[in-house]
């Protein structure tokens, strides 16, 4: 079994491209991770996700602990076997979903107590329990438990939240079972305050995580402020470890973040947009519901090799989406995921050539 490692092969200014080696295979960076929240990428077969070029996908601890439960998944052979995906899986810690989806959520030093959004059952999620669940799932990359600082937050609110995340990170690290080829990432917080981001990074680097995520962005602060934070936050992290920007997935945001030193991304945008009839292309987005596509016999993108573009016209996709056929969601999602993997491939090629990005979609 391979050791977990990150090898930077090319660098252009702050942008890096390379390979992350894991127990479940290699992933090329910069990488975009499709979101498979409940053990599935919506409207896609796992084999189809691999065909789009994805090297890794994301699963969600909160949703999987509720249904079908981590204990059931481990009895069935782990998440990889359960969903027939043999490549790397990163699982988030569950904290963000607990705080955003659950009613009567209460945050204490111990962890977060909450009621299930499904049936109202009460649960307690702690750094130890979150790490244990991710171990049971067999996650290739486990995320430390954190509090995603709401935006906007005052300096003092952000400081208190960041310090709690640091204490939780310590407990997560102490609970993590080290195995060859598996990894645990810490999450730095601090909202939009440089001093807090620097302190958070310093504290977490001392815990020697295998990689680091920048959390608490794309929560309403806007691109300009997000880029301002990314102008300095990645520089506080080790050069030789992966950097993951959580929940960011607009093409222009990805391109801007890569140019500031980020290696990994995840977002529901390509899948959610696909189900809602929006396609991403190199020439901008296409709302396939628009009546102007009813008689358009051309593909979404003439040089895209996804099944939607190889085999079907915009008129057919328009028809499927307008009448609510499942095939419409499948084809639009497949196209969007292919577009995002093509975008990452383009980004990696530009870094290898030492070229500035001259595109934003």
Curated annotation (Swiss-Prot):
Cofactor mode of binding and number, as noted: Binds 1 zinc ion per subunit.
Any one GO biological process: queuosine biosynthetic process
Binding site for Zn(2+): 304, 306, 309, 335
Binding, substrate: 92-96, 146, 189, 216
EC number(s) from the headed UniProt entry: 2.4.2.29
Catalytic reaction list: 7-aminomethyl-7-carbaguanine + guanosine(34) in tRNA = 7-aminomethyl-7-carbaguanosine(34) in tRNA + guanine
Enzyme class name: transferase
Region (RNA binding): 247-253, 271-275
Domain of life: Bacteria
GO CC, alphabetical: cytoplasm
Needed co-factor(s): Zn(2+)
GO molecular function: metal ion binding; tRNA-guanosine(34) queuine transglycosylase activity
Pathway in which the depicted protein is active: tRNA modification; tRNA-queuosine biosynthesis
Active site: 92, 266
Family of the protein in this entry: Belongs to the queuine tRNA-ribosyltransferase family.
Subunit note: Homodimer. Within each dimer, one monomer is responsible for RNA recognition and catalysis, while the other monomer binds to the replacement base PreQ1.
Protein name as catalogued: Queuine tRNA-ribosyltransferase
Native source organism of the sequence: Rickettsia rickettsii (strain Sheila Smith)
Lineage: Bacteria, Pseudomonadati, Pseudomonadota, Alphaproteobacteria, Rickettsiales
